[in-house]
Amino acid sequence: MKLTEQQIRFFDIFGFLHFPGLFANDIDYITKSFEQIWVDHNSSNQGKVHDGNIRSTIVPFIDQNEYLCSLIDDQRLDGIATTILGNDYNYVSSDGNFYVGDTPWHSDFSRPKKTIKIAFYLDEVTKDAGCLRVIPGSHKIGDVFATLLKETIVTRDPNETLLLGIQPNEVPAVAL
């Protein structure tokens, strides 16, 4: 899959792309593979299971499942990565999560080298429950806006009032 010129321009300006249904035909097997990693992890982790009280994370994640790992080479993902990063891009890491509550806004990367994050949401999410919120332009590391944003609103406490006098969930963002 090659991105269109419009998609590339959109990404360069806003810092994100959204592909709902891109893996619609594969999502059942992706979900089963995701769940199997958790079953395997729980059996080797003194039986600890996600109890729904706090976020649970496994890192690295897809590396533990041959099928999920093969998605890195799937033409849909590889095409996106190649178009944005070039043919010599490097896969760095993966994580699998069960989320609980809100996650405060944060920047995933602060490296000067162009990076992307590709995420699969296996549960239904809405703008009010669980979705990813993207602040357009926040991806431009070193940019005045991105720097001011990071200095002003990065918090680990979702109930903390920001320097702007608003709650973290009130920061203007695009809900995906």
What are these regions (language model features)?
Residues P104-W105, A119, N169-E170:
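Glycine-rich, charged/polar anion/phosphate-binding loops
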Residues S43, A129-L176:
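Double-stranded beta-helix
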Residues D95, S107, F120-E124, P136:
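Short, structured patches in soluble enzyme cores that scaffold and shape functional sites
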Residues P112-K127:
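Short, conserved beta-strand element in jelly-roll/cupin
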Residues Y29, F34-D40, F120, G137, ...:
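Hydrophobic alpha-helical segments
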Residues N87, Y99, E124-K127, K140:
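Short, charged/polar surface micro-motifs in flexible loops or helix N-caps
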Residues M1-F14, H18-K114:
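Non-heme Fe(II)-dependent double-stranded beta-helix
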